[in-house]
Amino acid sequence: MALPIIIDCDPGHDDAIALVLALASPELEVKAITSSAGNQTPEKTLRNVLRMLTLLKRPDIPVAGGAVKPLMRELIIADNVHGESGLDGPALPEPSFAPQSGTAVELMAKTLRESAQPVTIVSTGPQTNVALLLNSHPELHTKIARIVIMGGAMALGNWTPAAEFNIYVDPEAAEIVFQSGIPVVMAGLDVTHKAQIHAADIERFRAIGNPISTIVAELLDFFMEYHKDEKWGFVGAPLHDPCTIAWLLKPEIFTTVERWVGVETQGKYTQGMTVVDYYFLTGNKPNATVMVDVDRQGFVDLLAERLQYYA
């Protein structure tokens, strides 16, 4: 039986590729997709979800737009990484269908309520929508199997020295998610920076030769440019968000540890930092499965294998 999931995302090149991977995988049943503000403005990320589903010929999946700003802060976007549209690079179709009239939280709640089994929430942007869901629908917590997030880091930040972008955008929301009591799986920079796509991998995807693999290669061509900056020391581009879907499909290619994680919301230098109690110093019970390593080749092979689905 396929695993039911809701994807909350802010496309974003790597979010788009996470959608491609999820919808090529019969092991997963994508019951709804909601958009969050983050990589671009809320209007653009919602439009990008609709453009990707139009491209993938999946207008049957319910879509709803989410919160227009973080819980307690002004919105920050990453247009320097993802371009003016949020998905600069390839020529993507215009949306062929409209989103639902309700909000992301309403669609998530309806999906959870109607599901016969608990649903996994995959969240690849800021945690605003998920936090609003948890706060407004405590009666639905038992319908959530787990929350798999791309966000945070045990070690280094990528937006500030201490903070990863998704968590930095809305640290209060992330803290609600981590302390919710629902199992959380964290794909942070510790693992996503090891899930790099190299130039040769992009050519491998392009050579698959179907329309979707070609678009993925073109998305990666654009995404690669930002990551060529010498300050990162990368060989390729880290494919952050697809790590969440890849973990659901092939957990054996990831190394994880069980740890307590809290989010710093006040610090002078550390706002948005995910504080991981690696050495069990707090006495707090672990609340997260934290990814720390990945078999890079296994990750690339999984992407290549699933891109064949679109032949």
Swiss-Prot record:
EC number: 3.2.-.-
Keyword Transmembrane on entry: no
EC top class, as a word: hydrolase
Single biological process term from Gene Ontology: pyrimidine nucleobase metabolic process
Keywords: Glycosidase, Hydrolase
Gene Ontology cellular component terms for the protein in this record: cytosol
GO molecular function: purine nucleosidase activity; uridine nucleosidase activity
Active site: H240
Coiled-coil portions: none
InterPro entries tied to this protein: I/U_nuclsd_hydro_CS, Inosine/uridine_hydrolase_dom, IUNH, Pyrim_hydro_RihA, Ribo_hydro-like
Keyword Nuclease attached: no
One Pfam assignment: IU_nuc_hydro
HAMAP family: Pyrim_hydro_RihA (MF_01431)
Family statement: Belongs to the IUNH family. RihA subfamily.
Protein's job: Hydrolyzes cytidine or uridine to ribose and cytosine or uracil, respectively.
Matching PANTHER family: INOSINE-URIDINE PREFERRING NUCLEOSIDE HYDROLASE, URIDINE NUCLEOSIDASE
The protein's name: Pyrimidine-specific ribonucleoside hydrolase RihA
Native species: Salmonella heidelberg (strain SL476)
Taxonomic placement: Bacteria, Pseudomonadati, Pseudomonadota, Gammaproteobacteria, Enterobacterales
